[in-house]
Amino acid sequence: MTFEMLYSKIHRATITDANLNYIGSITIDEDLAKLAKLREGMKVEIVDVNNGERFSTYVILGKKRGKICVNGAAARKVAIGDVVIILAYASMNEDEINTHKPSIVLVDEKNEILEKG
């Protein structure tokens, strides 16, 4: 049996851009994404702290430092400056659950890393 468990989280990131005309996804600063163990194309859930919206999309790695841009139709669910939580889950068996520790990255309002847990 497997269970859906928290794999990683970027906590309180700030939306820096929203691009309605892009195909889809969320663009995340590559250094920040890698620190959170997020991979290109990985499914993530976005929770908007400001408006309560919750939606799923996939990761695109961005080159610009601090960039968090929601693309495509999901751009209508956020506003620039909104604070979001970016979550990734993984299916794990009981042995994996016992040894797994989620990667949690806390950032400030400029998406600079405050703490990595």
UniProtKB/Swiss-Prot annotation:
Q: How does it assemble?
A: Heterooctamer of four alpha and four beta subunits.
Q: How is the cofactor bound?
A: Binds 1 pyruvoyl group covalently per subunit.
Q: Which reaction does it catalyse?
A: L-aspartate + H(+) = beta-alanine + CO2
Record keywords, A-Z: Autocatalytic cleavage, Cytoplasm, Decarboxylase, Lyase, Pantothenate biosynthesis, Pyruvate, Schiff base, Zymogen
Q: Where in the cell is it found?
A: Cytoplasm
Q: Which cofactor does it need?
A: pyruvate
- Modified positions (Pyruvic acid (Ser)) in chain numbering: 25
What cellular component GO annotations does this protein have? cytosol
Q: Which CDD domains match?
A: Asp_decarbox
Query: What protein is this chain from?
Result: Aspartate 1-decarboxylase
Q: Which NCBIfam families match?
A: panD
> What domain of life does the UniProt record list for this protein's source?
Bacteria
Active site residues of this protein: 25 (schiff-base intermediate with substrate), 58 (proton donor)
- Single Gene Ontology BP annotation: alanine biosynthetic process
Pathway note: Cofactor biosynthesis; (R)-pantothenate biosynthesis; beta-alanine from L-aspartate: step 1/1
- Top EC group: lyase
Q: How is it modified after translation?
A: Is synthesized initially as an inactive proenzyme, which is activated by self-cleavage at a specific serine bond to produce a beta-subunit with a hydroxyl group at its C-terminus and an alpha-subunit with a pyruvoyl group at its N-terminus.
Query: Membrane-crossing residues?
Result: none
Which segments does the entry list as coiled coil? none
Q: Name one GO molecular function term.
A: aspartate 1-decarboxylase activity
Gene that encodes the chain = panD
Give the family, as the similarity comment puts it: Belongs to the PanD family.
**Residues that, per the record, bind substrate:** 57, 72-74
Q: Name one Pfam family in it.
A: Asp_decarbox
Protein function: Catalyzes the pyruvoyl-dependent decarboxylation of aspartate to produce beta-alanine.
The enzyme's E.C. designation: 4.1.1.11
